[in-house]
Amino acid sequence: MKRMVFSMVLAFVTMVVYSQDIKGKWITEAGDAQVEIYESNGKWNGKIVWLQKGPDTKDTHNSNEKLRSRKLMGVNILFGLTKKKDKWEGGRIYNPKNGKDYKCSMWMDGDKLKVRGHLGIFYETQTWKRAQ
């Protein structure tokens, strides 16, 4: 009986901790890309690891003409976020659909990740789902 209770408590604690961890693969709100979020030197970043249009999709909207021929696969679109309490902030997010980058903050909402891009007083928030 003690073993069963311990196992249930351990499973619950693991689930709670895992649900608050942004590390891993996430499906964007549109479902057309998957981003892997990882920590490096105390900063959180995210790179594209899957695209619905395929791995050869180019960064055609980049404001830097020299980067328009690069493949989006593997490109960091989240960079430099720092965890502060229950939020990750102080970083940037690149939007390959328009070639612009924005200030970024993120937070967990249950098992979903809220990703917000800021431009001055304007912002847009997306809800990303954890990939299986």
Spell out what each predicted region is:
Residues 131-132:
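Short, solvent-exposed mixed-charge patches
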Residues 1-4:
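Positively charged n-region of N-terminal signal peptides that target proteins for export
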Residues 22-23, 29-31, 35-94, 102:
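Central antiparallel beta-sheet cores of small beta-barrel/beta-sandwich binding domains
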